[in-house]
Amino acid sequence: MHNSPAVSSAKSFDLTSTAFLIVAFLTGIAGALQTPTLSIFLTDEVHARPAMVGFFFTGSAVIGILVSQFLAGRSDKRGDRKSLIVFCCLLGVLACTLFAWNRNYFVLLFVGVFLSSFGSTANPQMFALAREHADKTGREAVMFSSFLRAQVSLAWVIGPPLAYALAMGFSFTVMYLSAAVAFIVCGVMVWLFLPSMRKELPLATGTIEAPRRNRRDTLLLFVICTLMWGSNSLYIINMPLFIINELHLPEKLAGVMMGTAAGLEIPTMLIAGYFAKRLGKRFLMRVAAVGGVCFYAGMLMAHSPVILLGLQLLNAIFIGILGGIGMLYFQDLMPGQAGSATTLYTNTSRVGWIIAGSVAGIVAEIWNYHAVFWFAMVMIIATLFCLLRIKDV
């Protein structure tokens, strides 16, 4: 046998691909262990008032946008995302440690959130590195990215129930230290197994920006994804309160609905990735938006647990395609700027949270929880109009 080099290369590539999948899951689980219980942590442990809890989420989103955009531009210019991801994981460990033992609201907001923003940036930087690796090795980027996104969805199927079990069964300290362990393992995996692809500095200096011909479409896609994520954030904020206070259904139904949707998102992402080249990203995003319109129309009319659970298939189509294709759409509109493109996509979710937090509170205060879904519907209809004007790539 004289084919050992080829076999070795294949094994090396498989090991790298497997490492990417594990890192995607770990970055997802680190976030899924913290986010679902944050409002309870702030209320019960930090003793923050409801308005301060809302301000904490808004402040987190704003700081996260500033940090992630700074790191994205720096990584696209100077390269070697591997070292940056390890650095972000280290700061993520420090953030989790601070949340585990500190109960001062302002320390957590300004120091904890700042450190957490670096930790959460490990995820988009990992996706950017994966895209560059796929392009360099000739791997199908769409399917590879879809598998990685599916790992994050899997983390969100497992993470929230585990977070509640750790926080309520043991303590928030145990929960945050578990998230710190996830960051540690993630950093070690990145350092040992992910490729290091340094960029050569260009001779000409200047700022990296989207190609002129794509700037309009990039801005339009930012608006589209922000509206879609914003409507989803409205749903996440409003749905549990709507289920409990207006439909008077069991509290656990909200958790079952979220878990069902997250589980259904995984095959949706993989199917969307498989058909992306054949059908086009714009067409798939339109399918997602139509699914969103049907989903929110159903939420406006549904009253029984069976129908609410059945609607999660439409929710999975909506979020599964957005989560799997939206990021790739940005990357294709911004060639050579994988970090900026991926972070720009990630920040559409953060801006969506800022919008949703304000809208949900005001609408529910003036009218009721049911009315919030009308605003989500309006946002999705606006998305459909925007999708008629964007070009395919």
From Swiss-Prot:
Question: Which keywords accompany this UniProt record?
Answer: Cell inner membrane, Cell membrane, Membrane, Sugar transport, Transmembrane, Transmembrane helix, Transport
Its transmembrane ranges are 13-33, 51-71, 82-102, 106-126, 152-172, 174-194, 219-239, 253-273, 283-303, 306-326, 344-364, 366-386
In terms of superkingdom, the source organism counts as Bacteria
Query: Where would one find the signal peptide in this protein?
Result: none
- Primary localization: membrane
Where in the cell is the protein located?
Answer: Cell inner membrane
Annotated membrane topology is:
Multi-pass membrane protein
Query: GO BP, one example?
Result: cellular response to glucose-phosphate stress
Fetch the Pfam families from UniProt: MFS_1
Indicate whether Membrane appears among the record's keywords: yes
Which terms in the Gene Ontology molecular function aspect does this entry carry? carbohydrate:proton symporter activity
Q: Does the keyword Transcription regulation belong to this entry?
A: no
GO cellular component assignments = membrane; plasma membrane
Physiological role? Involved in the efflux of sugars. The physiological role may be the detoxification of non-metabolizable sugar analogs. Can transport lactose and glucose.
Which PANTHER family is this protein grouped with?
SUGAR EFFLUX TRANSPORTER A-RELATED
Family, as annotated: Belongs to the major facilitator superfamily. Set transporter family.
What name is this protein filed under?
Answer: Sugar efflux transporter B
Q: What organism, scientifically named, is this protein from?
A: Escherichia coli (strain K12)
User: Gene symbol?
Assistant: setB
